[in-house]
Amino acid sequence: MSLSVCRVLRQEALYCRAKAHLKEKQYGLAVVDLTPLSKEVRTAMGAEAKYQLAHAYFQLGSIELAEQEVMSFTQMQTSQQYWLAKSLILLADINIQRNDIFQAKQYLLALQTNYRQEDDIQSIIVEKLVALEEMNINEEVNEIEEDTL
């Protein structure tokens, strides 16, 4: 077997194992397998691995590491727009976690304007924007209730 075939088989094995870890919510184990896969984002597998790595860090509560992965992904050259868009949605979630609703909304609105693929990204963006609006309304109601007490 050639060296390149062995490398591809190893990557596929890591990918399958990482997906199994993610399904079982074993994010720490998934990080180990996703890290080497996420170095090459020009392929669909590598781009998904980069997103899943950032998402795994987010699930582990490592918000800074999740943000670093997303930001590095935005600097890498990839044609895998779906996984890049998913990463930017994750960046909005990171900002929500930090209670920076304004920035989260700006990421989502920019993505809504600029993303043109026919897939589930636009519906995810709409769901997130609706949820942000509901959060904003609930905060306003709470502030009014506190002011009247």
Ranges and model annotations:
Residues 1-149:
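Acidic, polar-rich low-complexity tracts and alpha-helical solenoid repeat scaffolds
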